[in-house]
Amino acid sequence: MDYKDTLLLPTTDFAMRGNLPECEPARYAKWDEQKVYEKMKAKREKSAISFNIHDGPPYANGHLHIGHALNKILKDIILKTHYFFGQGIRYTPGWDCHGLPIEQQVEVKLGDKKKSMSKSDIRQECRNWAKEFITVQKDEFKSLGVIGDWNDPYLTMKFKFEANIYRTLCEVAKKGLLVERSKPVFWSWAARSALAEAEVEYEDKEDYSLYVAFCLSDAACKKLGVSDAKAVIWTTTPWTLVANQAISLNPNEKYALTSEGYIIALPLKETLINQGIINGKILKEFASSELEGLSAINPLNGRDSRFILGEHVLMDGGTGLVHTAPGHGEDDYFASLKYGIEVIMPVDEAGLYDETLRVKKLLPEHLLNEFIGLHIFKANEKLIELLGDAAVKVSKFVHSYPFCWRTHKPVIYRATKQWFIAMDEPKLSGKTLRQTALEALKSVKFYPEVGVKRISSMIENRPDWCISRQRDWGVPIAFFRDSATKEPIFDSRVLEHVAKVFDEKGSDAWWNLEISELLPKGTNLDPSKLEKVTDILDVWFDSGSTWNAVLNSGDYDAGGYQADMYLEGSDQHRGWFQSSLLLSCAINQKAPYKSVLTHGFTVDGNGNKMSKSKGNVIAPSDVAKRYGVEILRLWVGLSDYSSDLKISDDILKQVAEQYRKIRNTIRFLLANINDLDDISSHFGTLDKWILARATKSFKEVSECFKNYEYSKGFNILLNFLSTDLSGIYLDICKDRLYCDEKDGLRRRSSQSAMAIIAKSLLSLIAPTLTYTVDEAIEFAPDIIKNGAKDAFDLVYEPLVFEFKIDDELLTSSREKFNEIIDVLKKDKIIKSTLEVILETSSNEILANDLDEIIDWYMVSFVRNIESDEFLAEFAVGNDKFKIVKADRYKCPRCWKYAAKIDNDLCPRCAKVLKRV
């Protein structure tokens, strides 16, 4: 007789294979249609705690890369963690719409056509470009399973948003922190604009290492008591030598005259000997102050180069005499400022030498036509040749050099008139912005903790923030200035009127309207005596003021200010985290965030940066099509985001395997509780054991998730699922689930334990595997749903089963038993553990319910030691065990060797069938 039909086999419509690439888009479309985000807000409306992440806006340019996916998925997991743990959430996604990346793409698209277009038309093209990619990226983000207020995202190019960015600027100006001055700043000659520190990336670049001798003036020689001497400077930028105005010396170091007639810093003597520049013989030592105010002669143009003192002169390389061109370096600028030295700037916005060479006589007359209009980087070789014998030593070396983050061309320092936010003006209740920001960071929690040191160090050492740009696409620095005095006008009525115009017409109005149309009625200002500032704001000012325009304005349902969390890549310590901090501290003297979480960058399986040229780029859309978004989400959950995250096809296959284990565990649980109507309050020993293990594991996992330690939490969870749950308990329970009476006490007890674990498991993994949990709820029996219509009706409730079970002997004896069984199977002595009886001397084990112990070892019987013949024996401490061949017959229904007669049912199975 075939007894298969008498077994209570598992059944569920929750598929073994998820077919994720096909099913996920339809499931998200359903969420969208059902307005799940609104439902989530409503479900937690009465929650005492609400949590918001303020979205760091990506550029509305291009398709998403894997870094975007990592960032948005991690945000989504964290928000949903708070949600499924019973808290309210707010998440308004946003986009950075202005700036160079978009403007460059539009320039490429327009080509020569741009030259004949008005600024307004160019800006409209940029607006259209941004709008197109917002639509593209929004769909791509939503496909990642990310829930948020996608119907009302914030866009920095919205009229009202532009107005609020401008209002933030006005508030900074009113605080007295906004200054306009000529100062060297990072300049992208390729983009023809100033750059902020955050817009500069460092790459290796080959440059000249050049030692140049400047002959001392007669007065300087006389002061040293010599007839001839040369000050030797070192530079890596020969093209700046034409703009040299001074030579800086360290005020605290000794200097020396060598036998070669060279002046050097004494501490660098050995270094220069090793360089082959001097032989080491010193003729005279003197203090740097002896040369202060005297001069040397620039060998390129015969101009005086004054000796000045500066703390910026270090003894870690060069000669200790620093070539000082105040227009081409911040240290040079400040050192020269103290001495009233003129800033000369012979380089135009495109990086070409201009007519300043002629006006200031920076090169001999006969060379001017050759150099004016020449790109500075093409001038190095020509200038070195012109130096002749004054070039003491010339070589090349590779060093880290600043590059424009968008054009990927090397940048220069160039003095131009720009707008700055002052870091060291004591305008904030007697404190500087630098001091206020550093103080505010002390109340911010960082994940990982090292983040606070990193951003604090950057704040401590950063220069004033250059916020002006000479481009088209951005929010204008919309100030009027007096045409005669050039002084900016910060009249509150005027500023607020301009802001209101922007509210209605957008910031394009600054260019489209006449000055008279931009002034409020009743003003005493004469439009004919005013002019407009034409610079635009640094795009980091846009994103840095989003806390004000989104959280503080009341225009969005995005949660409160301060935000509970800012979450971006670790590069944002110098970018968005910092710009947001500075603007919030400038206006409100506090950080815009309560916590900051940073993640590393995505790299390939070998730890290499991804690039198209290497062919190692992995697009999130490709992962979604091949594996499903859920695999990408689990990859984020399994990865330690505090460092760089590796991703490759092999890694994704491993993640897919882990996902398969999770899915199959869920499927097994659902399939085996399909006929359970009520949770039993009676639990057997093994049920108590698994519930106690689940309580402990889930508590550890939930604590990890609450602390955003997802990798650690998932490792604990996966270990529990594979070892305790699937590896032991579910395997053990198959016999009672399939073969016991439908309403048998042991079967219902195990089903109840499984249902309890399944409910907790689903709500615990829902933040990460939302698609899967939603699918599971769709096909789950009512005992699991408990009224839930979808995953978003779930709330995680901690398990509280504190059964005191001393399982040390049980687990250690089971491990040893299984080791021996593996050998017996390998030697083909047995095929199954059901073929044996376990005998033991352990009173502790024998004191348990016999059926529970039989199932624990998955044998046909357990008894006291009585057999002389045995297949194997082992001991655990003082307890002895024997593995004995079963002495009864195999039951054709349950396969246990418990039948008294061959081909007969065992007593248990006979009893079950009798009652059917």
UniProtKB/Swiss-Prot annotation:
Obligatory cofactor(s): Zn(2+)
Main localization of the protein described in the UniProt heading: cytoplasm
Residues annotated to bind ATP: 612
GO terms under cellular component: cytosol
Motif 'HIGH' region: where in chain: 58-68
Record's catalysed reaction(s): tRNA(Ile) + L-isoleucine + ATP = L-isoleucyl-tRNA(Ile) + AMP + diphosphate
Subcellular location: Cytoplasm
Renumbered ranges of motif 'KMSKS' region: 609-613
Residues binding Zn(2+): 891, 894, 906, 909
EC top class named in words: ligase
GO BP annotations, alphabetical order: isoleucyl-tRNA aminoacylation
Cofactor note: Binds 1 zinc ion per subunit.
Its biological purpose: Catalyzes the attachment of isoleucine to tRNA(Ile). As IleRS can inadvertently accommodate and process structurally similar amino acids such as valine, to avoid such errors it has two additional distinct tRNA(Ile)-dependent editing activities. One activity is designated as 'pretransfer' editing and involves the hydrolysis of activated Val-AMP. The other activity is designated 'posttransfer' editing and involves deacylation of mischarged Val-tRNA(Ile).
Family membership: Belongs to the class-I aminoacyl-tRNA synthetase family. IleS type 1 subfamily.
Domain notes: IleRS has two distinct active sites: one for aminoacylation and one for editing. The misactivated valine is translocated from the active site to the editing site, which sterically excludes the correctly activated isoleucine. The single editing site contains two valyl binding pockets, one specific for each substrate (Val-AMP or Val-tRNA(Ile)).
Subunit text: Monomer.
Protein name from the UniProt record: Isoleucine--tRNA ligase
Lineage per the UniProt record: Bacteria, Pseudomonadati, Campylobacterota, Epsilonproteobacteria, Campylobacterales
